[in-house]
Amino acid sequence: MDVNPTLLFLKVPAQNAISTTFPYTGDPPYSHGTGTGYTMDTVNRTHQYSEKGKWTTNTETGAPQLNPIDGPLPEDNEPSGYAQTDCVLEAMAFLEESHPGIFENSCLETMEVVQQTRVDRLTQGRQTYDWTLNRNQPAATALANTIEVFRSNGLTANESGRLIDFLKDVMESMDKEEIEITTHFQRKRRVRDNMTKKMVTQRTIGKKKQRVNKRSYLIRALTLNTMTKDAERGKLKRRAIATPGMQIRGFVYFVETLARSICEKLEQSGLPVGGNEKKAKLANVVRKMMTNSQDTELSFTITGDNTKWNENQNPRMFLAMITYITKNQPEWFRNILSIAPIMFSNKMARLGKGYMFESKRMKLRTQIPAEMLASIDLKYFNESTRKKIEKIRPLLIDGTASLSPGMMMGMFNMLSTVLGVSILNLGQKKYTKTTYWWDGLQSSDDFALIVNAPNHEGIQAGVDRFYRTCKLVGINMSKKKSYINRTGTFEFTSFFYRYGFVANFSMELPSFGVSGINESADMSIGVTVIKNNMINNDLGPATAQMALQLFIKDYRYTYRCHRGDTQIQTRRSFELKKLWEQTRSKAGLLVSDGGPNLYNIRNLHIPEVCLKWELMDEDYQGRLCNPLNPFVSHKEIESVNNAVVMPAHGPAKSMEYDAVATTHSWIPKRNRSILNTSQRGILEDEQMYQKCCNLFEKFFPSSSYRRPVGISSMVEAMVSRARIDARIDFESGRIKKEEFSEIMKICSTIEELRRQK
């Protein structure tokens, strides 16, 4: 039957229909090919916004650098990065005046964090630029490689395990005349296969030592690798994002810790909180502005958009902010926090893989690596690419582009929020000294501005003043993309406010459905998503019930586990029917074994195994929860696991779900094809790393695991732990004397081997 879509909306208030206009159903667009073009765009744009600055040359690397700070004030509405140092410092001073002690207290909190943070903090995060191999790696591997290189070059402060000591090594590494690194390479050779007598290519992986001089090392240490941001909805063009190397990460972490601590104390900051807490915080600011404007004043809200926030921010400005925020603090603390912005004002952007050329006529493909862009003849490129390359050439060194102004995406979200809030703070009447005043919300580059004034002229004047004040610190409010409404209706970080926040349910759509981890986890995640949306996103009972039925249907099609009494034929139906017929209590079968669905919206919080346990046949229970089942490679499963769910915007977020280990919680094996590539050496390192960590966790179950104090290696810690445990077990009679002495002998042997090594 045909449904007239307008009928659906007759009874729906307009604000609730907003979510139907969002581009959030279907697959998001992904990028293919290299990100080189996007990165060049970023570099060229950033320099264009700051073009009236001063050019200098970095004495260590020879990179040309553009410094727009205190540059000419803009005379038009074009975006520009000419922040004025004195204005930024004054904004900081007023922020401190309105929040007495805020900087002081945040510094004290951060100092404590700095002294306690361990190096393993840097293993969090996904892809990281690994400077030793000059490409991206998982964070843990990149860190291990960096530490390995540091130690072989006589930098050993990191052995204490404290992040601050690792950073001391980073500083020292920059003073060394040369550094020796280990790189992976592969040899190919043609050999005859004995079985088939055909020629085959054999690949062997080697590691070779390589010396890097000071200049090359500095370039690598200051390099941000770039990639294309994937899965961005609602955009025609892709854009580049950056991933910094291990030298920069630790310093950034401490700066962001300080800025986070400040943001927590600022009522206008949308970071670092999220979800319902964020909504409550925002609602407070709106309430304040509306209460004060009841009778005499008008109140308007701008749903704000800034032009190219990152590309107009400047690390030198952040340095000025940090210098001000940490005044009166100990010298070591000020130094460690000022390194991140200094490194960023000397940063290099790696241009990625380069360009792919193909000749349709000759069926040839060839890749032009980024390193060649400086010297290659431009006649091969089309016009737009040619322009890009010409523009970027003066900035190129070894396939990286010098990029002093601008901040790459997502590096200093917290600190840039502090800057934004400091301008919102200037809207108080005591600072505007006139009839209009403003307040608002800031979350990284997103803002909402609420202006109150006795009449429309006052509102206009207030907005103009805000706009011009922002220009002074390198923030460019976009007049084209911002819009103004009577206070009570606005959008901020994809929250829609209409006399209270409206649930924007469409944003959660991508996280509904079957995740594809395994049968056990998928069932659990699916129902948890529905439960969470009932709690947080106005998912009503009828819709939730429907979502649940759709989910079960989707799940059965994904795993081909239709009910045992169904007519649908799949390649699993023979086995499932047999199981169905043998089972006395059919209600006890899991959905993934062809059982019925017992979920409804009242019991979504109960894992399926627990829900059906009492209904199961005894032998089915035994098979389902059997740790000795040879077909299952079991993880030791905590009671709560984390799944990564994809909301429609923002990063993938982690969601907890209950995990019950059954024969359905399998872990798929690693793809074999990686074993024949140059990644193989890295994979072996990674597996060794994994094995060590797993072993360590066996000795220190999480309940008894405290942060190690003092310097002891993992091996020493495990040996001493083994001795203590063995003694306790022996004295309580859990192990025999022979076993006890054998354990002690093994411990001594390990220590002996360590001494010989």
UniProtKB/Swiss-Prot annotation:
Which transformation does this protein catalyse, written as a reaction? RNA(n) + a ribonucleoside 5'-triphosphate = RNA(n+1) + diphosphate
Q: How is it modified after translation?
A: Phosphorylated by host PRKCA.
Q: Where is this motif: Nuclear localization signal?
A: 187-195, 203-216
Cellular compartments per GO CC: host cell cytoplasm; host cell nucleus
- From what organism does this protein derive? Influenza A virus (strain A/Kiev/59/1979 H1N1)
- The name this protein carries in UniProt is RNA-directed RNA polymerase catalytic subunit
**Stretches with biased composition (Polar residues):** 55-64
Q: What is the lineage of its organism?
A: Viruses, Riboviria, Orthornavirae, Negarnaviricota, Polyploviricotina
Q: Specify the RdRp catalytic domain's residue ranges.
A: 286-483
- InterPro entries reported in the protein's UniProt record: RNA-dir_pol_NSvirus, RNA_pol_PB1_influenza
Task of the protein: RNA-dependent RNA polymerase which is responsible for replication and transcription of virus RNA segments. The transcription of viral mRNAs occurs by a unique mechanism called cap-snatching. 5' methylated caps of cellular mRNAs are cleaved after 10-13 nucleotides by PA. In turn, these short capped RNAs are used as primers by PB1 for transcription of viral mRNAs. During virus replication, PB1 initiates RNA synthesis and copy vRNA into complementary RNA (cRNA) which in turn serves as a template for the production of more vRNAs.
Q: What domain of life?
A: Viruses
- Region of interest called Disordered, as start-end residue ranges on this chain: 50-82
Region annotation (Promoter-binding site) ranges: 249-256
Q: Name one GO biological process term.
A: DNA-templated transcription
Q: Kindly state which keywords UniProt assigns to this record, in alphabetical order.
A: Eukaryotic host gene expression shutoff by virus, Eukaryotic host transcription shutoff by virus, Host cytoplasm, Host gene expression shutoff by virus, Host nucleus, Host-virus interaction, Inhibition of host RNA polymerase II by virus, Nucleotide-binding, Nucleotidyltransferase, Phosphoprotein, RNA-directed RNA polymerase, Transferase, Viral RNA replication, Viral transcription
How is the quaternary structure described? Answer: Influenza RNA polymerase is composed of three subunits: PB1, PB2 and PA. Interacts (via N-terminus) with PA (via C-terminus). Interacts (via C-terminus) with PB2 (via N-terminus); this interaction is essential for transcription initiation. Interacts (via C-terminus) with human PKP2 (via N-terminus); the interaction competitively inhibits the interaction between the RNA polymerase subunits PB1 and PB2.
